[in-house]
């Protein structure tokens, strides 16, 4: 198979990961995430990545499947994952001026920005602490 097929397969694997066990990254738009977060009284966690991003893959493989991280994010957030080139990705990257990957955007249930985290923290407790601090800024 050519490079296009390899890219399609990689995207399918990435999508499969985000709907598999671990952190529940929902396949919904930001607008839908805001509506859901408002209804469920949860914050919004946006994971921003790009194809070929090695640190993004490391976080995907080591952090988000972890039971403690998944339990925390699934309980406290409506989580979505966005690619810088697809779906809502380009608009989100522009709106929040995302320049580096991975970047994590934390929003209030109504969609207001809490803050942005740029991190490759693989210590689950430290990463949760960092997210919790940002979530509680307002």
Report residues per predicted region.
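Loop/turn elements at helix/coil->beta-strand transitions in domains of secreted/extracellular proteins
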Residues: 40-44, 75-80, 108-112
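Local sequence-structure signature of Cys/Sec-based thiol-disulfide redox active-site neighborhoods
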Residues: 30-68
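Thiol-based oxidoreductase modules, predominantly thioredoxin-like and allied folds used
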Residues: 24-27, 50, 62-88
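Non-catalytic, surface beta->alpha helical segment in thiol-disulfide oxidoreductase systems
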Residues: 1-11, 99-138
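N-terminal leader/targeting and pre-domain segments
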Residues: 2-40, 136-137
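Extracytoplasmic/secreted proteins, especially bacterial periplasmic and envelope-associated proteins
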Residues: 4, 28-32, 55-58, 68, ...
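Extracellular/periplasmic catalytic domains that process cell-envelope and extracellular macromolecules
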Residues: 38-39, 71-74, 97-100
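Structural alpha/beta surface segment adjacent to cysteine/selenocysteine redox centers
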Residues: 87-101, 105
